[in-house]
Amino acid sequence: MSFKDLRSFIDHLESQGELKRISHPVDPNLEMTEIADRVLRAKGPALLFENPVGNDMPVLANLFGTPKRVAMALGKEDPLALREVGELLAFLKEPEPPRGFKDAIAKIPMFKQALNMPPKTVRNPPCQQVVKTGEEVDLTKLPIQHCWPGDVAPLVTWGLTITKGPRQKRQNLGIYRQQLLGRDKLIMRWLDHRGGALDFKDFKEKHPGERYPVVVALGSDPVTILGAVTPVPDSMSEYAFAGLLRGERTDVCKAISCDLEVPATSEIILEGYIDPDEMAEEGPYGDHTGYYNETDSFPVFTVTHITHRKDAIYHSTYTGRPPDEPAMLGVALNEVFVPILRKQYPEIIDFYLPPEGCSYRMAVISIRKQYPGHAKRVMMGAWSFLRQFMYTKFIVVVDEDVNCRDWNDVIWAITTRMDPKRDTVMIENTPIDYLDFASPVAGLGSKMGMDATNKWEGETDREWGTPIVMDQAVKDKVDQIWADLGIDDAPTL
């Protein structure tokens, strides 16, 4: 099942008991965060606040608050099915010519999917049913959430920022938080390595002093939203990838004030520009780390047009100490990363980003070890292969007999198969998340790799331990007689 707009997905979630409408008045200032946080931690439904205090526009929260709902947004019922998305991405990143007739037949479905890539331009789009310009533009009339007591101002959190660089044919979609600065101004907090910031940098070099057109879409269809947070190849538009996932082309329309294309079924569109000479101090804000971050200077986004659907819905979220919505999104997208990594490193058995590690700061990888030093090669590969892992501070590599998603197994491997000096890799002066205040310098810090695999000849001179394993015949016999032993239900092993 695919969803052409946010509303059809909301209806589907409600029919499945995955969305709750809240008619009681709730304040976007702090109260929504507290309610959404409690519901998310209880693995509860998405929330539609129908009567936000001081506003008549409903607010949608916790949309992707469970891995199951992330899968549902992509037409899947099980998060594990998202590995199919990863297989598609792996193919797109490194397409291989068919190795023969049978292989060509097997690849036909992927080639057919590729035909659905280009977005489709539509007229009279829903997102432009209402158009506001000039004095009508007033961001303070949107129910923008003020998430935490120490936040400096309300924060736009789920906006898809649409940019285009002078050297790129494709448009870039990214999600960057935006601080409310005034009636028509937001602070665009994009880090230097993100697509929007790179497009802006290229534009400034080619057109010094000129205004840079930017559009922000709120409440787009769920597939396009998820396309913006998925590791799409740099040469490919997120619109095209969303079309692949949906099985049909993404509907877009031309923005009113510039040539950028926007998702046609979005709830709200903010159009405007960034003046390269206008910067503002952003923050502090509570973030996905569970702490308030430092302030810093970022570009100011001036909004010249607001367009929206009739009876528009405002899509929002909060970030805080895991679990939060980004952490749940990370759990689901974990399954997307596995096939991509396996294509480059076939020896990888599984890959896990623990949500309590802020989604990406720690990774555990199980491998089929084949030679001395193999674990270190995999560490280096994981750090460098995908941009998403450049901020991963800790990588633990374990053998295939260890479940990398079970901390009991992982801690056992670390404490029995590691010598701290021999098996720990420390790398200094590497890129680190700007929000990581534990690093000695903002944006620059160290990484640690831990080789918790069995050691081979050349890695140790000692006789290595043999794991204790019961004979299978004995286990089978005990299974047969268990009911006669008078013991409670057999434990699951």
Swiss-Prot record:
Write out the residues that bind Mn(2+).
Answer: 172, 238
Q: What Gene Ontology cellular-component terms does the record carry? A: cytosol; plasma membrane
Bilayer topology annotation: Peripheral membrane protein
Q: Which domain of life is it from?
A: Bacteria
Q: Does the keyword Manganese apply?
A: yes
Q: For this protein, what does the record note about how its cofactor is bound?
A: Binds 1 prenylated FMN per subunit.
This protein's record includes keyword Cell membrane: yes
Name the needed cofactors: prenylated FMN; Mn(2+)
From the UniProt record, give the pathway where this protein acts: Cofactor biosynthesis; ubiquinone biosynthesis
* Ligand binding (prenylated FMN): 175-177, 189-191, 194-195
Q: Pfam families this protein is in?
A: UbiD (PF01977), UbiD_C (PF20696), UbiD_N (PF20695)
Return one Gene Ontology term, BP aspect.
Answer: ubiquinone biosynthetic process
The active-site annotation reads 287 (proton donor)
Q: How does it assemble?
A: Homohexamer.
Listed name of the protein: 3-octaprenyl-4-hydroxybenzoate carboxy-lyase
